Curated annotation (Swiss-Prot):
Keywords: Nucleus, Ribosome biogenesis, rRNA processing. Its main location: nucleus. The lineage of its organism: Eukaryota, Viridiplantae, Streptophyta, Embryophyta, Tracheophyta. GO terms for cellular component: nucleolus; nucleoplasm. This is Bystin.
Length: 444
């Protein structure tokens, strides 16, 4: 019979309070090449590795999220976009400016243009300001400023600002490049314009009214990310907006690169409102086609609630232009929670037409319907009565009955829900087990 082997006993306990006892063996590893040579990975290579790793982690996380909850996967990107992430995204896009190949992701979707009803367009023209002054551009402003400073330049058609001749020659060459630009890298001199104190004068030398659409798109990306709100507002108002309106009126549609430039301009929503939306409505010459194209950008893109409220309040107080109703309707359909001040301003806006003898366009009635549908519980009782009086004078055979129904079938601001609903709430029965009634029993 074979001899039994002795059991090996470990004298050390499995769990010890002393950290020095529970020491584990370290496996010897072969040193890596850069460790053996005592060299570090270069900063550029390290940054590329980190970017690639983060991209892969995000891709894996998105796939796992899509498997767990397919219905919400489509909205994951939109819901996760915060202000900091938007800044990071824009910085990455700025790094990719030199890689621009002239193509856009959503170009196939843009080809489906919305048709404009000619009758509606003629009705809108009756609300336009016939005596409105022409819109000023950056060139007009700089020329006027130069001529006011120096009377000797009054006879020159396009005078040059007083600068170093080398700088003037350089940026005139940049302007010629921008007029022919389609794809590829932009000159480094152009990227430095945003850091200059007199950037408007330098930009004037490049003749921005002659830039190609793709060049204006690239310029909008650079200016939106590097200039402050007040500065980029002037770029939007005096460079981007005149070019967009000119392109729409000339071709009856908007070049896709200019459309993308408008979308990029929404990165600074305050500057977009002050530089594009408000001047457009204030001009009194915005036609229906311009409103539909620019309004589609507001419809597709996300706008912060605060800026949306400010825009609605300002539009409600402006002198009415037919297309103002279109922008009001688009912003109301965002369904943001509005302050009472904005809601009261909108009521006052609609009540201005109670004595107007003109036939209001359909979009005016639709904007009123949208307002009542979204915020009927936040309108005062007196304001609802005033709106009903308005609807007796401004009628539409299809829209007006819907507005009246919404006004009647809703509670007023400050009122609670119908108290009749609480009467049907179940009341727990009280039972006394010591006071049980006698139950008669039948005898057999």
């Amino acid at each position: 019979m074979a001899k039994k082997r002795d059991r090996i006993v470990n004298t050390q306990p499995f769990i010890s309070d002393d950290a020095s006892v529970a020491s584990s063996r370290k496996r010897s590893k072969v040193p890596k090449t850069h460790q053996k040579q005592e060299k570090l990975i270069e900063a550029g290579m390290s940054e590329k590795i980190m970017k690639q790793a983060l991209a892969q982690q995000k891709e894996v996380a998105d796939e796992e999220n899509a498997e767990r909850n397919p219905s919400s996967a489509a909205f994951a990107v939109a819901g996760a976009a915060t202000a900091g992430e938007e800044q990071k995204i824009l910085e990455e896009e700025e790094d990719d400016i030199d890689d621009f190949d002239g193509t856009f992701e959503n170009q196939s979707q843009f080809d489906k243009q919305e048709e404009i009803n000619e009758d509606d367009e003629k009705l809108f023209e009756s609300f336009l300001n016939k005596n409105a002054p022409p819109q000023r551009t950056l060139t007009d402003i700089i020329i006027k400023k130069l001529k006011d400073k120096d009377a000797d330049l009054a006879e020159e058609e396009r005078p040059d600002p007083k600068m170093d001749p080398a700088i003037t020659k350089l940026y005139k060459g940049v302007g010629k490049f921008m007029s022919e630009y389609t794809v590829g890298k932009l000159p480094k001199a152009f990227k430095l314009v945003t850091s200059m104190e007199h950037w408007e004068d330098v930009l004037y030398l490049t003749e921005p009214e002659k830039w190609s659409p793709n060049a204006l798109y690239q310029a909008t990306r650079i200016f939106a990310s590097n200039l402050k709100d007040r500065q980029v507002q002037r770029f939007y108002n005096y460079v981007l907006l005149p070019r967009v309106r000119e392109d729409i009126r000339k071709h009856k549609k908007l070049h896709f690169a200019l459309y993308q430039a408008l979308k990029k301009s929404l990165y600074k929503p305050s500057a977009f409102n002050q530089g594009i939306l408000f001047p457009l409505c204030k001009s009194g010459t915005c036609n229906l086609r311009e409103a539909v194209i620019i309004g589609s950008i507001l419809e597709k893109c996300s706008i912060p609630m605060l800026h949306s409220c400010v825009a609605l309040n300002r539009l409600a107080e402006m002198d009415y232009c037919g297309t103002t109703s279109y922008f009001i309707k688009v912003l109301l359909e965002k369904k943001y929670c509005m302050p009472y001040r904005v809601l009261d301003a909108l009521v006052a806006h609609f009540m201005r037409f109670v004595d107007d003898i003109r036939v209001m366009p359909v979009i005016w009635h639709q904007s009123l319907l949208t307002f009542v549908q979204r915020y009927k519980y936040e309108i005062l009782k007196e304001d609802k009565e005033h709106l009903q009086t308005l609807l007796q004078r401004q009628k539409h055979h299809l829209v007006t009955p819907e507005i009246l129904r919404e006004l009647k079938d809703s509670r007023n601001r400050g009122e609670k829900e119908d108290p009749m609903v609480d009467n049907f709430a179940p009341v727990p029965a009280k039972e006394d087990r010591f006071d049980i009634p006698e139950v008669p029993m039948e005898e057999d």
